[in-house]
């Protein structure tokens, strides 16, 4: 099933299919539920066959996990359970590890660092559901390090994985676009906008749209035309920018922009030698960057005008309070109280340096000025507060390990 989505001869129609998938899911969740289980039904015997197992597993993991946000937007629970992607990843990683006899010692170390926090809770308020919600993500990361240990992914396989992550993002874009009312009916204030996200969480939708922007740009700059039509690819890319800006959730668009700039920096200044078989054409960097920046700025200006200049105020960190003079524009205001949450996590870590307060416990224990406890929005501070020194080591290993591994690779 998934291999047909990677057939370049029908690439345009694969994108049209995913646009229709998002459009129809906006009216009935039966569509995405049916598609999700059709993919599982056809892929299960495919991955049981061990021929080219890693390639098939990688494709299944990326595509099924990428469908989750669309499923959440369409409110498919309990048919497609909440957080299903974490369980799918865990199951498929374990399947691949067992069949391949992987021994990723770095991943085992990560597991050893993250698991202890599951066995204590200083808040005495962490339910089993909350515990699993908080611990499964880091566990999947550790299992992923073990699973991918020793795998060689060539350029073609990498681009296929990028496409499989991009297709569901296009569906999310279509869903949000269809559910967005007429712009004249939307009250654009200086906070995240749920009208332009299909009524779903603006942070999650904005993140997917920012990821879609980055992946589209990555394929574009590497000379890979997604739909076999350059103009259509450009429309998709600008669609991600337009809808992402309209969410008024800054993280997704800023994250996408930072990812693009980081990519260009690495492509320009990397000292890695390029092989003839997997060469990425570096001279195209400037050729693609300049028109992309111009179009991006034009879209930003259009959306800013559409929202009565509220978009530019939002990205400056202004709120109704700061404009009225009743609130000071500082780092905490600019980050929508995330800085205060970060400091609260650091305070918890100071009091529990070695082990932290336990997985999921920081929400109830964090000292903030908010009446309702808020979940952490910065993964580093959550790791420090809940896992202590072991959380810090977990983060540092994840940060350093890819670069140390990359030094051993002589070609791209």
Language model regions located:
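N-terminal signal-anchor transmembrane segment
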Residues: 2-98, 116-124
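Membrane-interface helix-loop-helix junctions at transmembrane boundaries of multi-pass membrane enzymes
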Residues: 47-55, 98-107, 219-234, 274-281, ...
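Aromatic-anchored transmembrane helix interface
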Residues: 79-93, 106-150, 163-173, 208
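Alpha-helical transmembrane segments of multi-pass inner-membrane proteins
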Residues: 118, 143-144, 159-187, 200-270, ...
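A membrane-periplasm/extracellular boundary helix in multi-pass inner-membrane enzymes
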Residues: 180, 246, 264-327, 347-351
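Long extracytoplasmic/lumenal interhelical loops at the membrane interface
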Residues: 186-188, 196-198, 322-387
């Amino acid at each position: 099933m998934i291999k047909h989505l990677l057939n370049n001869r029908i690439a345009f129609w694969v994108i049209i299919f995913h646009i229709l998938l998002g459009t129809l899911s906006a009216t009935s969740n039966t569509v995405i539920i049916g598609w999700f289980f059709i993919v599982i039904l056809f892929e299960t015997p495919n991955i049981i066959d061990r021929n080219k197992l890693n390639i098939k597993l990688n494709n299944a993991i990326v595509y099924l996990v990428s469908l989750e946000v669309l499923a959440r937007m369409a409110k498919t629970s309990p048919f497609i359970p909440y957080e299903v992607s974490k369980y799918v990843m865990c199951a498929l990683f374990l399947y691949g590890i067992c069949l391949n006899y992987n021994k990723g010692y770095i991943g085992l170390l990560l597991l050893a660092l993250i698991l202890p926090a599951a066995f204590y809770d200083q808040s005495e308020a962490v339910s089993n559901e909350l515990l699993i919600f908080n611990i499964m993500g880091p566990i999947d990361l550790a299992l992923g390090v073990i699973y991918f240990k020793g795998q060689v992914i060539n350029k073609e396989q990498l681009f296929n994985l990028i496409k499989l992550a991009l297709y569901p993002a296009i569906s999310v874009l279509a869903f949000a676009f269809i559910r967005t009312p007429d712009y004249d009916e939307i009250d654009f204030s200086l906070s995240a906008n749920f009208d332009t996200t299909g009524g779903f969480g603006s942070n999650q939708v904005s993140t997917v749209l920012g990821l879609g922007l980055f992946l589209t740009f990555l394929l574009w700059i590497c000379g890979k035309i997604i739909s076999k039509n350059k103009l259509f690819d450009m429309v998709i890319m600008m669609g991600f920018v337009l809808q992402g800006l309209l969410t008024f959730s800054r993280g997704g668009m800023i994250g996408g922009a930072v990812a693009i700039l980081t990519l260009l920096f690495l492509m320009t200044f990397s000292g890695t030698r390029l092989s003839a078989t997997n060469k990425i054409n570096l001279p195209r960097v400037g050729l693609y960057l300049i028109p992309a920046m111009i179009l991006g700025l034009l879209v930003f200006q259009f959306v800013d005008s559409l929202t009565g200049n509220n978009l530019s105020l939002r990205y400056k960190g202004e709120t109704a309070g700061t404009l009225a003079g009743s609130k000071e524009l500082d780092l905490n205001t600019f980050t929508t109280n995330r800085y205060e949450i970060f400091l609260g996590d650091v305070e918890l870590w100071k009091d529990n340096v070695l082990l932290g307060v336990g997985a999921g416990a920081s929400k109830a224990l964090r000292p903030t000025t908010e009446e309702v406890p808020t979940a952490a929005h910065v993964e580093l501070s959550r790791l420090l507060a809940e896992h202590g020194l072991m959380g810090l080591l977990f983060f540092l290993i994840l940060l350093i390990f890819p670069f140390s591994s990359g030094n051993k690779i002589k070609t791209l």
